[in-house]
Design a protein with these regions (language model features):
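Walker A/P-loop
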Residues: 26
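Conserved beta-strand/loop subsegment of P-loop NTPase cores
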Residues: 89-92, 121-138, 170-181
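Amphipathic helical hotspot of TIR/SEFIR-family domains
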Residues: 102-130
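Short, flexible boundary segments at extreme N-termini or domain junctions of P-loop NTPases and their
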Residues: 1-17
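ATP-binding Walker
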Residues: 23
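Canonical P-loop GTPase G-domain recognition
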Residues: 140-203
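Inter-motif core of Ras-like GTPase G domains
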Residues: 77-103, 116-120
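Switch I (effector-binding) loop of TRAFAC-class P-loop GTPase G-domains
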Residues: 33-65, 75
Length: 203
């Protein structure tokens, strides 16, 4: 991965992290402020012993703002709208494991969220980059069983879920919406997730 390209794409950018309570916003924000990612990420059973080159995320000088949880009351989306309007990049986090399990309550919540976000994106003069980030995949048995070289198939199956197809459509379609899946259960899992996100930022 080319760190120089990431620096050009993201340095000093304003980043909004949106999502309901319990999706991992605080964890991701903290990692983006203090963590680091390897120059090259290989999924391994055991941590790599070799001291490979690492990139310190604070070097990006990201201006990260995280949303508070909002209730179902539409008036509570005002804070999200403010964050959206000030952002160059938006990360919308959701519980991928619950959508895979067909949790209707979570489906209803993310549908409401994307109705709002999608409307803001459509009317935005300078459209921010938009990412749907599915977290808690470690709680899905199929994710745990999926070998690294078949991970693309896992993502494709997730994107094919009717609710995800709807969310992507509301966000502006497949050309405008990046979908990234992973886990933040461990430090290494979080590194892998952020690595995937950054790869899509510069692709």
């Amino acid at each position: 991965m080319k760190w120089d390209a990431i620096m050009v794409a993201l340095r000093g950018k304003r980043l909004a992290v949106l999502g309901a309570r319990g999706v991992g916003k605080t964890h991701l924000v903290k990692f983006l402020a203090t963590g680091s990612i390897p120059a090259e990420y290989k999924q391994t059973v055991a941590p790599e012993k070799s001291a490979s080159r690492r990139f310190q995320l604070h070097d990006l000088d990201l201006k990260v703002k995280s949303s508070l949880d909002v209730s179902g009351d539409k008036a509570a989306y005002g804070e999200w709208k403010q964050l959206h309007d000030q952002a160059d990049v938006i990360f919308y986090l959701l519980r991928a494991d619950r959508l895979i399990a067909g949790d209707h309550k979570v489906e209803s919540r993310v549908r409401d969220d994307l109705k709002h976000i999608g409307g803001w994106l459509q009317t935005s003069v300078s459209r921010p980059r938009f990412f749907i980030i599915g977290t808690h995949c470690d709680l899905d048995a199929n994710f745990v069983r999926t070998p690294a070289d078949n991970f693309g198939d896992y993502v494709d199956r997730f994107r094919a879920l009717p609710i995800v197809t709807e969310l992507v459509s509301r966000g502006g379609g497949a050309q405008q919406v990046n979908v990234v899946l992973g886990s933040m259960k461990s430090h290494q899992d979080t590194e892998a997730l952020v690595y995937q996100i950054f790869r899509q930022v510069v692709s």
